[in-house]
């Protein structure tokens, strides 16, 4: 059987249409796993439909609220490739739905939900049979009837909500809960399960998702800073230190904290990878002296870099790619919603098996000459610099700020972002976040009167800090955010980037430049609408874009 998936930047694009619709997607996801993820999403939409109904009776089931976004997160690009676990999530969704339904019926014997997913049952235990059942729920099943524009808007909403669900799970892990957010999530998820086909309603929904995600990023920021302190500028070594070692990748700071606690005094050093780099800025994480540095570059290079790492690797969230290609699958471990067939999975917070493996491996034989980069420009630090920025602008020492961030990826056109960073004029500042920074974060940019020209604000969700800074600057200057000497040049790859974009658009931020390509699910008509309404456009050449942005 074949699949249909068009959710990430590397999706197949042909004159006949966009999307991975073969036996395997470009990410390595098989048709079986992709189809079963469609089935899981349908089950989750049915669960959300009953969660909406339950709230009408004052019933709030926290098990449902915590499970639903987490399971949805498992369908995000490069997270879970393990078909049996995807089916397990679907079964759990249905069990929770039935329990919630029973609670509703206990209050009102006539309780009903008008949603096509509300009574979904799995037809078999056989994966092949379930894959055939999943064909009912493939996202483009009614494309001929609704057209590409409606399909594209549905997918914009679905993928945007998926990105928000990922951030909801990150916040939940840190003890953050907001009933209004979960109520809104369930309402949108259930509505998407009705196969909506009204263009205006879908556009409004996409903005609602963006506004909701701003709240999600706020509680995630509160969770991270509440537990680990406010990030402050910190130098991080990106070269090897002699000794036994463990590499931890992903976004989950709690997993990193637990690993650091359990490795303390064992002689095992811990390195961050990918989106875990900003962890070094948090006081409660950097206090561990055996958190010795950051290893590697963008996630897309992991098959080469992980093969060279002389210790075990822990994947806490996206992005994992096939570890069997370079034969390190015997020393990579998955956590939480992450999965790869045949790779060992850690069900809880006990990292002892990983630590034992690290102690049995060679580790790095010698320390390399250190190369230090600076991270840790979190929300509090950025706000503390607001007056300095305004002073530099007023004295014409600072001409422009470029927010140059987003996802990284393998496409060759992404060298644009390296080239762009290198030609930013000396009187301009680069604010960066997310893993796209690996395209230029080891380069030297100097400073403007002591203020670094490259300011690393953190993970992708730390777009929240950048937004708060922009709002603060606008308030102090008595203008709108769009009137600031600020340009956003964003790289996208997957669904977290989609919801960050929706968040910015929902807040009224205009004239964003994105690349390296437009999302495959957005038609020329939809791109034209976004351009007309928000000034959103794709990158052209580095020189042309720089000229246009500086003259705006």
Curated annotation (Swiss-Prot):
InterPro entries: HCP/CODH, Hydroxylam_reduct, Prismane-like_a/b-sand, Prismane-like_sf, Prismane_a-bundle. Its main location: cytoplasm. [2Fe-2S] cluster binds at residues 5, 8, 20, 27. The keyword Iron-sulfur applies. SUPFAM superfamilies: Prismane protein-like. Binds 1 [2Fe-2S] cluster. Binds 1 hybrid [4Fe-2O-2S] cluster. GO terms for molecular function: 2 iron, 2 sulfur cluster binding; hydroxylamine reductase activity; metal ion binding; peroxidase activity. It comes from the Bacteria. Disulfide bonds: none annotated. Pfam families: Prismane. GO terms for cellular component: cytoplasm. It is found in: Cytoplasm. Its EC number is 1.7.99.1. It is an enzyme of class 1 (oxidoreductase). Hybrid [4Fe-2O-2S] cluster binds at residues 251, 275, 319, 407, 435, 460, 494, 496. The modification Cysteine persulfide is found at residue 407. Catalyzes the reduction of hydroxylamine to form NH(3) and H(2)O. This is Hydroxylamine reductase. The gene is hcp.
């Amino acid at each position: 059987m074949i699949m249909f998936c068009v959710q990430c930047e590397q999706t197949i694009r042909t004159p006949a249409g966009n999307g991975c619709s073969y036996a395997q997607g470009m990410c390595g996801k098989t048709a079986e796993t992709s189809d079963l993820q469609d089935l899981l999403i349908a089950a989750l939409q049915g669960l959300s439909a009953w969660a909406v109904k339950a709230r009408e009776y004052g019933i709030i089931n926290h098990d449902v609220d915590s499970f639903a976004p987490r399971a949805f997160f498992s369908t995000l690009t490069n997270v879970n490739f393990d078909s049996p676990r995807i089916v397990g999530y679907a079964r759990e969704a249905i069990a929770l739905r039935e329990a919630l339904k029973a609670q509703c019926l206990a209050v009102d014997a006539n309780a009903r939900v008008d949603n096509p997913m509300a009574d979904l049952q799995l037809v078999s235990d056989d994966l092949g049979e379930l894959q055939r059942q999943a064909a009912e729920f493939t996202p483009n099943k009614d494309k001929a009837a609704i057209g590409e524009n409606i399909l594209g808007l549905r997918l914009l909403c679905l993928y945007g909500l998926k990105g928000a669900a990922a951030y909801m799970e990150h916040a939940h892990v840190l003890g953050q809960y907001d009933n209004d957010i979960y109520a809104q999530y369930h309402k949108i998820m259930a509505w998407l399960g009705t196969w909506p086909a009204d263009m205006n309603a879908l556009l409004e929904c996409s903005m609602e998702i963006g506004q909701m995600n701003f709240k999600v990023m706020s509680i995630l920021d509160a969770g991270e800073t509440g537990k680990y302190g406010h990030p402050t500028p910190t130098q991080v070594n990106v070269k090897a230190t002699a000794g036994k070692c463990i590499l931890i990748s992903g976004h989950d700071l709690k997993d990193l904290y637990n690993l650091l606690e359990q490795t303390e005094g064992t002689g095992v050093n811990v390195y961050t990878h990918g989106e875990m780099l900003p962890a070094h800025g948090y006081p409660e994480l950097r206090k561990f002296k055996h958190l010795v540095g950051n290893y590697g570059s963008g996630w897309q290079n992991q098959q080469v870099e992980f093969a060279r790492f002389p210790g075990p690797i822990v994947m806490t969230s996206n992005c994992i790619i096939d570890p069997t290609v370079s034969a390190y699958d015997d020393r990579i471990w998955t956590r939480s919603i992450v999965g790869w067939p045949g790779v060992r999975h850690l069900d809880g917070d006990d990292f002892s098996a990983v630590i034992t493996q690290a102690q049995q491996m060679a580790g790095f034989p010698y320390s390399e000459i250190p190369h230090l980069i600076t991270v840790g420009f979190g929300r509090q630090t950025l706000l503390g610099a607001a007056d300095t920025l305004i002073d530099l602008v007023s004295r014409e020492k600072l001409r422009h700020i470029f927010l140059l961030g987003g996802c990284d990826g393998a496409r060759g056109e992404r060298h644009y972002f390296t080239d762009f960073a290198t030609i930013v004029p000396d009187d301009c500042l680069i604010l960066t976040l997310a893993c796209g920074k690996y395209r230029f974060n080891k380069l030297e940019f100097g400073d403007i009167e002591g203020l670094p020209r490259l300011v690393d604000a953190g993970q992708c969700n730390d777009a929240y800090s950048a937004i708060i800074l922009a709002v603060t600057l606008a308030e102090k200057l008595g203008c709108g955010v769009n009137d600031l000497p600020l340009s956003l040049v964003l790289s996208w790859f997957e669904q977290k980037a989609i919801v960050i974009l929706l968040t910015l658009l929902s807040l009224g931020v205009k004239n964003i430049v994105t690349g390296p390509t437009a999302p495959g699910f957005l038609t020329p008509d939809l791109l034209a609408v976004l351009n007309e309404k928000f000034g959103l456009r794709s990158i052209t050449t580095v020189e042309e874009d720089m000229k246009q942005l500086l003259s705006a």
